[in-house]
Amino acid sequence: MFLGIDTSCYTTSVAIVSDCGEIVADKRRLLTVAEGKRGLRQSEGVFQHMKNLPVLIEEIKDFLPKIKTIAVSAKPRNKEDSYMPVFLAGTSFARTLSASLDVPLIFTDHQNGHIMAAAKSAAFMPEKEFIAIHLSGGTTELLKVDSENAEIIGKTLDIPAGQLIDRIGVMCGLMFPCGKEMDEKAAPTQSKLPVSVKGSNINFSGAEIQAERLFKSGVPADEIFTAVFWCIATSLEKAVKNAGDYHILPVGGVSSNTVIRQHLTKAFGEKVHFTHPKYMTDNAVGVAYICRERS
């Protein structure tokens, strides 16, 4: 069996896959954000991860004697200068567990974990380059992925899609993180937000300003939510089409949004490969699969 550990900005995750690739365990705990706040300080995230990890490991303790290798997300993406303190919680814990179990430790990154989780659970086994759309609270990137590398070919030049969603949600009185509740409450609307795409790069700050204006003018929040999701989906459609003709794998929590899924499915048909929303949000399943493949 192979153990994956991931400590992202808002979720503590551990997962185990078997020798044959079956998901044996998938445990997660969301970090707590105070009411009215739009996020956590990294130091607070580290503190909460260090409290959560022993609890999650306790839940999978019966499998620990069978673990052959451990893998952990050591940084946000596979770049030399990629760094966030929250991942130190996972790496520190993984080092200790590796030593105590006397098994090898593999270091990977959060982004590749997302891609692997989505690809495996969607049964997407590409034979050539494809585009992964990474949509989360801290990231909006288009990645050209092959068997060796994931190259950023487009991104937001200001705020990520998830941050746009959470800012608008908190403005409208929702608890952070807001994406799931906004998805559930989104109502039909005639309101539109500006779409700003140059090549495969996107700007969302103009959409945020217009959403604030709509809210102050009395447009119902539920309609603004739909306008936000439409803006994100339309921006992604344009950015991907500008990148070329590829199969597409959406990953990250924002990708699970209903409006975005429907829009991209209509735009790209069989070329877009959505997995179950459970494997789009932050998890350690992909890290466990990476562990299995690299062992």
Role assignments for model-derived ranges:
Residues T7-S8, A15, V24-D26, P126-K128, ...:
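A short helix-loop
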Residues S8-F47, E151-I152:
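Short glycine-rich, Thr/Ser-proximal phosphate-binding strand/loop in the N-terminal lobe
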Residues L56-T69, V219, A239-Y246:
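Phosphate/pyrophosphate-binding loops at sites that engage ATP/ADP/AMP, CoA/4′-phosphopantetheine
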Residues V72-K75, S136-G138, L249-T258:
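Glycine-rich beta-strand-to-loop/alpha-helix junction loops that act as flexible
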Residues V103-I131, Y289-E293:
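Conserved phosphate-binding catalytic cores of ATP/NTP-utilizing and phosphoryl-transfer enzymes
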Residues E184-I248, V254-V272, R292-S295:
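A contiguous, well-structured pocket-lining segment that forms one wall/lid of small-molecule binding clefts
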